[in-house]
Regions:
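Amphipathic, well-packed alpha-helical segments that form the structural scaffold of globular domains
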Residues: 14, 34-37, 83, 105
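An amphipathic alpha-helix signature
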Residues: 6, 10, 33, 79-83, ...
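Divalent metal-dependent phosphate-bond-processing catalytic cores, especially two-metal-ion Mg2+/Mn2+ enzymes
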Residues: 18-26, 30, 34-44, 57, ...
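Short alpha-helical hairpin
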Residues: 1-14, 55
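His-Asp-centered metal-binding catalytic motifs of divalent-metal-dependent phosphohydrolases/nucleases
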Residues: 48-70, 74, 78, 82, ...
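A short, mixed-charge helix-start or loop-turn motif at secondary-structure junctions
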Residues: 14-19, 64
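Hydrophobic, well-structured mid-protein blocks that either form specific transmembrane helices
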Residues: 85-124
Length: 192
């Protein structure tokens, strides 16, 4: 991996995220890059330079999303910023540039785009790993406070959302089993 390119991407991210503290700051970025590096070590065929560069740059669109009050998607804004940034970097092939841009565009859990390539998936997983444990809990409180938002959804909101509301999902299977059990119990009560 090119230490020069990795250091340059880190420096650019530091500039973009300077004074931005909603839990998607440079500390988060460094943890994601470390997670990505560990994943690359364990996954044959991964392109460490491409993955680590994408990891350093993945949240550079966050300040725009924050200041627009969520009207802009940080992953999409970030992908465009990354595209412009990479035009100044000669160490990357055109294919690597596209891979990095696409990974940044596809890293958001709530985004419309899903990971497609190995680079996309490694970045996606490295980012999500940082939402686990005590650090993830602290980031959730920090983000909710900075955005003046709730930490949870009501059951109705959760079930109406895409993650829990899709047909065939675990929640629907459980709901169906529960409804069948209630019918059986009702029949027992009525007949007994």
């Amino acid at each position: 991996m090119s230490d020069t390119e990795s250091a340059a991407a880190r420096s650019y991210a530091e500039i973009c995220l300077r004074s931005f503290g909603t839990g998607h700051d440079m500390d988060h970025t460094l943890r994601v890059a470390a997670n990505a590096d560990r994943l690359c070590s364990a996954i044959p065929g991964s392109d460490r330079l491409t993955v680590i560069t994408a990891a350093f740059l993945h949240d550079i669109g966050r300040p725009v999303e924050h200041y627009c009050r969520g009207k802009a998607c940080h992953a999409q804004v970030g992908a465009e910023l990354v595209r412009e940034y990479l035009k100044t970097r000669s160490a990357f092939s055109d294919a690597q540039r596209e891979e990095i841009v696409n990974a940044v565009a596809r890293h958001r859990y709530r985004g419309k785009l899903r990971p497609v390539t190995l680079t996309d998936q490694i970045l996606f997983d490295a980012d999500k790993l940082d939402s686990l444990g005590a650090v993830g809990l602290g980031r959730a409180f920090l983000f909710a406070g900075a955005c003046n938002s709730r930490l949870h959804n009501t059951a109705e909101e959760a079930l109406a959302g895409e993650a829990y509301g899709r047909e065939g999902s675990g929640i629907h299977c459980c709901r169906g089993a529960l409804e069948r059990r209630c019918v059986c119990l009702s029949a027992e009560i009525c007949s007994g």
